[in-house]
């Protein structure tokens, strides 16, 4: 018996040494491509750059990932509790890897053949978001898991629990190209995280399990069920009183409207300014010490546009075009040639008309074009009679206060402010005024 004990002790010792050796190699990145401490510290999240008017109104954004990072001070404690109760109830107890959770997963999955409910901690999820499995050559699931465990422990060594919560909530996607809790709060509820109510927090945290499946717009029933489950978990773990639970479950969820989400101020100007920003930064980035990317670096870009003047300009252009359109239609929609036979006969004799007649006969027979194309041709014909205009308001200093490139940016992105059409008679007052300044009499002929 004593001999068996010595053999067992030696085996345990040997395996222990091997385990420690492998752990050291993995920890230092010699095996499984585990990120180093320096690489983890140097990680930077992509943030959207925001474009503002001169009166500090957000006009639009430039981004690859629509994200704005916030500090833990801007994240309410209830939101942290909601996340912990849902994703990692022992978050404040483990060192990045929840051994109890792993045992539970193993027992349920292997022995009981039940759904284990997942075993990844918040820190491990953060690691997966930062370093996706697809970025590593080895595709073995076990190797991925071991890599995540060691990386999670490194993250816990570098950052406090609050910092990990902060990084996690700034990293995760919430659907609709919303990354991070700040952008998601604004998109779904038109609020900042600090303004969210508990049922709204639970709805957003519920999206982490599946952004499409639990989308409150597309799948309101599934979203509500998920939200209520999260609220009950919070109550069971002592984060929510019974009265708060009942109130939150009964409260109807009010999502932000499309108008609240849409940044529709000065769209033509934004189209122009985004190109300008890239050109300006290209010249600045020639310095070896500075390289700025408007789509990833979270810049704040301020313009001369005044949102109040812009709104008045857009309204004035639309209203005036309505009046002019009515006048145009009354004047030009009439088929005057029907009342003048001689003009009609002259038109029919033209070679150009004969060419059009062949096309018209093909359209009428249906032998050349599909109904869809014919409908598009009708739309194009209607467009020919639609009046277009552009408008700018510029101070004597050269600052652009308003920029209206057309009637409807959603319908046509052609910017009439930048168009190179001939000015026509609009230029005559400039010529005449210059002539008068030069002493030329208005009675002179040239």
Where are these regions (language model features)?
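N-terminal post-signal-peptidase region of extra-cytosolic proteins
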Residues: 36-37, 63-72, 86, 149
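Short extracytoplasmic
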Residues: 42-68
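Flexible, acidic/glycine-enriched loop-and-adjacent beta/alpha segments
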Residues: 71-122, 182
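Non-catalytic, structured segments within soluble enzyme domains
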Residues: 23, 115-346
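N-terminal type II signal-anchor transmembrane helix
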Residues: 1-52, 90, 109-110, 324
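Short pre-catalytic segments that frame enzyme active sites
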Residues: 60-68, 183, 212, 216, ...
């Amino acid at each position: 018996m004593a001999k068996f004990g010595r053999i067992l002790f030696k085996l345990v010792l040997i395996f222990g040494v091997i385990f420690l050796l492998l752990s050291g190699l993995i920890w230092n990145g010699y095996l499984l491509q585990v990120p180093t401490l320096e690489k983890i510290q140097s990680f930077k999240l992509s943030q959207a750059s925001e474009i503002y008017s001169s009166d500090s109104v957000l006009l639009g954004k430039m981004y690859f990932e629509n994200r704005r990072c916030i500090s833990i001070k801007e994240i309410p404690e209830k939101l942290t509790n909601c996340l912990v109760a849902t994703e990692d109830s022992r978050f404040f107890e483990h060192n990045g890897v929840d051994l109890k959770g792993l045992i539970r997963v193993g027992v349920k999955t292997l022995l009981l053949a039940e759904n284990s409910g997942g075993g990844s901690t918040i820190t491990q999820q953060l690691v997966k978001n930062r370093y996706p499995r697809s970025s590593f050559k080895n595709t073995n699931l076990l190797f991925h898991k071991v890599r995540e465990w060691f990386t999670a422990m490194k993250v816990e060594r570098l950052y406090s629990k609050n910092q990990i919560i902060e990084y996690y909530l700034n990293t995760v996607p919430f659907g609709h190209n919303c990354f991070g809790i700040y952008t998601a709060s604004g998109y779904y509820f038109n609020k900042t995280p600090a303004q969210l109510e508990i049922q709204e927090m639970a709805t957003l945290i519920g999206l982490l399990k599946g952004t499409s499946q639990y989308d409150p717009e597309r799948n309101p029933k599934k979203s509500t069920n998920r939200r209520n489950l999260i609220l009950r978990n919070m109550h069971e773990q002592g984060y929510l009183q019974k009265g708060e639970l009942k109130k939150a479950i009964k409260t109807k969820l009010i999502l932000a409207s499309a108008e609240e989400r849409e940044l529709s101020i000065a769209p033509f100007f934004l189209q122009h300014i985004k190109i300008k920003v890239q050109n300006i930064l290209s010249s600045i980035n020639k310095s070896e010490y500075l390289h700025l990317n408007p789509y990833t670096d979270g810049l704040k870009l301020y313009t001369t546009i005044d949102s109040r003047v812009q709104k008045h300009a857009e309204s004035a252009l639309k209203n005036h075009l309505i009046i002019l359109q009515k006048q145009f239609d009354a004047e030009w929609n009439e088929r005057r040639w029907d009342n003048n036979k001689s003009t009609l006969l002259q038109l029919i004799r033209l070679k150009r008309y004969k060419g059009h007649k062949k096309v018209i006969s093909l359209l009428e027979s249906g032998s050349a074009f599909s109904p869809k194309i014919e409908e598009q041709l009708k739309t194009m014909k209607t467009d020919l009679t639609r009046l277009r205009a552009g408008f700018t308001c510029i101070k004597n200093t050269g600052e652009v206060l308003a920029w209206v490139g057309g009637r409807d940016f959603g319908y046509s992105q052609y910017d009439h402010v930048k168009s190179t059409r001939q000015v026509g008679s609009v230029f005559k007052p400039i010529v005449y005024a210059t002539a008068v300044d030069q002493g030329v009499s208005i009675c002179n002929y040239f």
